[in-house]
Amino acid sequence: MKTAKTVDEQIDILRSRGIIINDPEKAKEILNDIGYYRLGFYFFPFEKTHPQTTNRTHEVIPGTQFEDAVALYYFDFDLRNILNRYLTRVEVAFRTYLTYYMSLQYKTDPLWFVSSTVVIQSFINDFDRIVYQSEAFRKNQQIKRHHNKYPADKYAPAWKTVEFMTFGSIVRLYKSIDNKDDKKAIARNFGVGKSAVFATYIDAIYTLRNKCAHGLALFDLQLPNGIIAAKGPKIGLTGADCQNLNGAITVLLYVLKHISQNRANDLQRELDELYTRFKKQRVELVEILKKCSGLNF
């Protein structure tokens, strides 16, 4: 097992890999700020063996500078700050419409989210463990207040319970709805005719949102499930774009447009400004970034 290294030792390791460090003191300041391990993700595309993830030597292509990885890091940082606001908008709208539509469809059953006639059994089986008995739910004041007022209720009604579920649980709830017409109706509200296609859209948005929420690298994002593009709306995704950052942002823009065209316009404008600024400041890194992310500069 590797042992912890001082910042000076970290500098030595980076230099041994061929990374040019013109200002060691500034590099130390950055390593203390960002962290050696975190910054390592941004050196990866400069490695000779990239995109290979096994048997890596960590040696970089000649001419790679410390500032190159830092520039990618701050591009990611700025992109994350832009995306967070719009991802939240989509999450709230998705949660709201799913709750609204399903609660009206099953008016006589305020606990439709655990009803075997509405959702598949595996979701119901896991609901207590994953959702209702989670620490967040046990400490939630609104949920506690409901049960204090109605002690006989096993669960709070959908409009309370679903409001406090995690985005991941909401996505799983959508996929667990048994009636295909219900799923299709929710998908259509966001401009997608097929529920299977929409499930991949919302999966991509969820993955992107999680990366942003946890401060993880975005530029080389890979979607675990991919996006179904061929049978969905014409959004211009083919090949690798169905699994990369460009694909995730494309479906985010598409879904956001069906929530608010103005907000979609705002997001596109902010992205264009970020891309233009990056091109002006670090034009030599544009091709590397495009190769990793699929973004269209």
Predicted regions and their residues:
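Acidic/aromatic/glycine-rich contiguous surface patches that form carbohydrate-binding/processing clefts
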Residues: 215
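Extended intrinsically disordered or low-complexity regions, especially N/C-terminal cytosolic tails and loops
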Residues: 1-208, 219-297
